[in-house]
Amino acid sequence: MKKTSLLCLFIGLLALCSCRQPVPRVSIFADHIATIAHQENISFAEAATRVRALSYEGVDVSTTIAADRLRTLDSLGFCHACAIANIGYIDGPQEAAEEQALAFMKAQGWSQLLLVPGLVPEGTDDDAVEEAIARIAAFVERAAGEGLRVMVEDYDNPRSLCYDTAALDRLFAASPVLGHVFDTGNYLYCHEDVLQALDHFRSRVQHVHLKDRRDDGSCPAVGGGIVPMAEVIGRLRASGYEGWLTVEHYGSRIMYDDASRSIAAVRAMMAK
């Protein structure tokens, strides 16, 4: 049998069973697949096929992803790990952006949404920040009423509404149902202890971004930096975490190689 036929058969079998595999499962960003396509000078579909063959089971996508790319991912059996919406709440009410995000979720069958709430301009007063937080809480409640889960991550910019533990605590105090996307590398970025942050927010963690970092701040493949990844994964599993582990290394110049190394490292850590 030709190699291409064997690959298609393998991917077909993955598509049939991957969404029913034991948790946690490993996913990747659709943006990383697009980067692979660009770096390898191949189509998005071919890049997605190669990534799927590495045994990635899910994908994180923007709610503005091109329709043809979304169809490709679905056809290859990628599970819906998490959708992502950038909504700048500090700029005022965001009805149009909210409607777009919710429409995508419902039309395409996604249940988890990472909300990236924008950056706070320098000099913004605290009343404006409180108004933005109230808008976020209202959107989260509305989405929950429609059966959707909304989360925020620890975002690596000091002007973010969810930059560090203190900022996240402020958001979570405003919404009992707001979830957390735990980004391992971003706690290191804001000079906080990753494991302490995990213990602090464990009850809110509903999705995970496995981002490693080097001392210079760059993001290598999982296991190539100084983030205690094995300990993070071990604590998540011990606590009964049933969500996704999405590998992340934006900025990689060898994205396919990093994707291959990352999933191998994560599988090895989970096998212990």
Report each predicted region and the residues it spans.
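Positively charged n-region of N-terminal signal peptides that target proteins for export
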Residues: 1-5
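Bacterial N-terminal signal peptides
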Residues: 8-15
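N-terminal pre-domain/capping segments
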Residues: 19-107, 111, 179, 267-272
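Structural preference for beta-strand elements that scaffold enzyme active sites
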Residues: 25-27, 58, 79-82, 111-114, ...
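Active-site beta-loop-alpha junctions enriched in small/polar residues
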Residues: 29-33, 62-64, 85-89, 118-120, ...
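Conserved, mostly hydrophobic/aromatic
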Residues: 51, 59, 105, 150, ...
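Active-site groove signature of glycoside hydrolases
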Residues: 105-125, 146-156, 246-247
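Acidic/histidine-rich catalytic cores of soluble enzymes
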Residues: 144-226
